[in-house]
């Protein structure tokens, strides 16, 4: 999918795709990048709104990850395809509950308490948004999941973790929760 991007053109993705052994050819053509290298050479451009750099189109969301490298926050692109894939996985996980005993089938009609980062994302100058990956995924949850979703928009937007937990504790007695879910840390 990225063959027509700057990255795909530079590293000759077409050659890899046409190769008898595409995976091996890809490894030969594309050097390993650490975060600083890929950010400086590629991803930094996308923060300025440049499209088709390392993935087709413009990047609208960035997951922020603090790390051990030079940057205080690492900006990691979150593509539309990743968000779509996440929506499909929501559905798969819910449908997988059907295979289990009667208690789990009843739980399918109950709420999902999603514990994660704030959905109140930081807006960048080129129109993109950045925040915790879990906050992005919660904000971009599928429309059909809204009915089951707790803690709700107001509480989910809170960036102060202690305040968020206090609000959840205060309101949880009124929710019919069958599942507690979250996004694993990096």
Regions found by a protein language model. Name each.
Residues 1-64, 70-185:
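Nucleotide 5′-phosphate-binding alpha/beta core
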